């Protein structure tokens, strides 16, 4: 039995989908444990490109159980659309290979409308995807969310729960001169989608526990990245859930006593979608080259990702926060063109040096990166599958990051295809 939690150590888009797809070849189940359809995974298999938002990456492989845990906020329409899209490509999702937690809060039309309204009212936008994720999590915390299990209720009970939800939302809408939403409209939405969702619903905490008891291998697939975490990220430019490894235990109901490997993903450089601090950002030809070579467009938003040098301060802090035991580096090939490559090793502000990210947004806005410069390799690493065949300067770059982060790199991704992977150490898959 092996349990592996996969988390991003930057601002998301580290390539978790491809890596989980690769790992799931040796797994029995893959579990999503937080976020919603505001996160996107792009997976390339035999030149076919699949873009997933809610479904775990394992759905592309036969014989794997894919699970959505209770920590996910579930947009039922987005899920059904994703399932139908895969079906049109010959991939069938059934109750035998897919399960949804009965405790998932549902993202409804009222949440998406609230997301757009709140973003318009903010003085400084945070760059929300307008998918309704934040308002849904807010309703969950305030104990008024409609959950998947509520779809089993008699209609009159469901009506009462929706009425309670809308008593809050309609009050807000009234204050900004927006028309109220009728309870019956939301109830009808739910009744129409219920038959398509309920066949997949089960107590997934129990399902996962049974898999662990049977010594099965489970991958826990994180969404977004460490510095989008609601508690540990660059607040307020963050998502609405916890994105670090510990959320896996809460977001699907497993206990921390189970032996778990925690795999942290980093790009060989840094990217960010949307607003917020970005200490190594390159608004120049360097950033443009990274953007073009890395094809840096958001899977969900289709927005251009901002690009910059590798930030080892952030990555080291992320390693500590999640207790990372091994690293995966992705998109090494994007750096092939540079004659020299920089790594941010410290921040400075007013003659003070920081080896961590201060929580204060004000101080964050003043931080300047302190770089260490390494020679580039200017030789193609694209599609490489052998570590010893990498250019020596590429190996030196990898070793420098291992040295700073104090964690070994197990895998290196050198292209979008499933098998474009350098395996340095895969012992974690078997013990």
From Swiss-Prot:
Binding site for GTP: 12-18, 40-42, 305, 331-333, 413-415
Cofactor remark: Binds 1 Mg(2+) ion per subunit.
Protein residues bound to IMP: 13-16, 38-41, 129, 143, 224, 239, 303
GO molecular function: adenylosuccinate synthase activity; GTP binding; magnesium ion binding
The keyword Metal-binding appears for this protein: yes
Positions with a binding annotation for Mg(2+): 13, 40
Pfam families cross-referenced by the UniProt entry: Adenylsucc_synt (PF00709)
List of catalytic residues: 13, 41
PANTHER family: ADENYLOSUCCINATE SYNTHETASE
Function statement: Plays an important role in the de novo pathway of purine nucleotide biosynthesis. Catalyzes the first committed step in the biosynthesis of AMP from IMP.
Protein name: Adenylosuccinate synthetase
Organism field: Ehrlichia canis (strain Jake)
Phylogenetic classification of the source organism: Bacteria, Pseudomonadati, Pseudomonadota, Alphaproteobacteria, Rickettsiales
Gene designation: purA
